[in-house]
Amino acid sequence: MHQDQLFVQTVKRKKHSSYAGEISPAVPNLVNRDFYAEKPNRLWLTDVTEFHIPAGKIYLSSIIDCFDGLPVTWTNVTSPNANLVNTMLDHAIEILTDQDHPIIHSDRVCHYRWPGWIEQKEKAGLTHSMSKKGCSPDNSACEGFFGRMKNESFYNRSWA
């Protein structure tokens, strides 16, 4: 076929991407993987994780304080909607004093870019920091917390 200059024409397929673009302007990464805090309520990390149980899925959203690595607050629901992170943020804001204005660091998922969440955060005087797109090490302390929690409390257990 090559001698007769016959070639197979192939169509190059594009990779599928669910990325639909930015839904709001991204804020800078103020943390830069430095997860150290001298005092409580200086640097918070937040993320959402899911648990698969026999009845379906449960979504857990929490705020972790970098001072001691413990959760400040958390919420869980069966549907990952705005109420999940808004309720969690409400609970966290309730424990702050007038002198506390922590940086709250998150990844770039839509939960932390909804106008309601942004407005709530700004009213409380919180400074937002975001990871780079698709860069999980930028929020590794929070991801690590979820990993330890699942290993110690969830995996290898029967929930039926």
PLM regions and their residue ranges:
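Charged DNA-binding/catalytic regions of mobile-element recombinases
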Residues: 1-160
